[in-house]
């Protein structure tokens, strides 16, 4: 398990990542990881209630599905956070089949209230989380037939979500792009530029093997200030 403490946007964050125990089903391994993460967070005066973003990793499709189901059970109700899930064998250093990356935040305002906002109609993951003046958006995807069209559709989806969250692109501070291995990062960069989104303060890229949907070629997460 790796734990990192850092300050960002005038707030304190804790990032925890770990691979699940090998030799057990992915949902069981995921539940065990959440227990370990809770213990780690409590050592700093936080808990899973402070989760802002959660990424689920599966070695294969079945592992991702099981791990995501476990996440949905544990981070439910007001504990819901911005979420995404991916398939990537290269993410793992062990023989485990499930892993988690969790981002928790200590709010600058002790009276700040977490406001999870669901999709309409609801899905098994959150649309976005409003928390102490920040908005954490789940990973958005597209089923368009080619990569450049998927980027364009996702940018449009994020635009709609930003409007719903009463913020806008000028307040987006970070985009995380997770791209299907074998596809061209430059295509994504060009499409973001053509949409006028290439000047965002921080854009990071990660290669993965797959997503929840067979047609998805990328997934984009956004973080914005209010």
Regions found by a protein language model. Give the residues of each.
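N-terminal presequence-like segments and the immediate start of the first folded domain
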Residues: 1-173, 179-226
């Amino acid at each position: 398990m790796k734990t990192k403490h850092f300050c960002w946007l005038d707030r304190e964050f804790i990032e925890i990542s770990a691979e699940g125990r090998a030799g057990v089903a992915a949902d069981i391994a995921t539940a065990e990881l959440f227990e370990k993460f809770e213990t780690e967070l409590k050592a700093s005066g936080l808990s899973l209630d402070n989760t802002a973003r959660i990424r689920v990793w599966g070695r294969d499709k079945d592992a991702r599905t099981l791990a995501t189901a476990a996440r949905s059970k544990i981070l439910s109700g007001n504990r819901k956070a911005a979420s995404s899930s991916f398939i990537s064998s290269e993410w793992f250093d062990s023989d485990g089949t499930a892993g988690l990356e969790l981002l928790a935040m200590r709010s600058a305002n002790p009276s700040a209230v977490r406001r999870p906002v669901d999709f309409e109609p609801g899905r098994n993951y959150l649309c976005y989380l409003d928390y102490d003046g920040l908005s954490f958006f789940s990973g958005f995807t597209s089923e368009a037939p080619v990569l450049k069209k998927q980027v364009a559709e996702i940018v449009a989806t994020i635009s709609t979500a930003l409007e719903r969250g009463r913020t806008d692109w000028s307040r987006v501070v970070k985009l995380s792009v997770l791209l299907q291995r074998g596809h061209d990062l430059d295509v994504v960069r060009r499409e973001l530029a053509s949409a006028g989104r290439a000047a965002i303060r921080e854009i990071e890229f990660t290669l993965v093997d797959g997503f929840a949907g067979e047609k998805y070629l990328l997934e984009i997460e956004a973080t914005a200030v209010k």
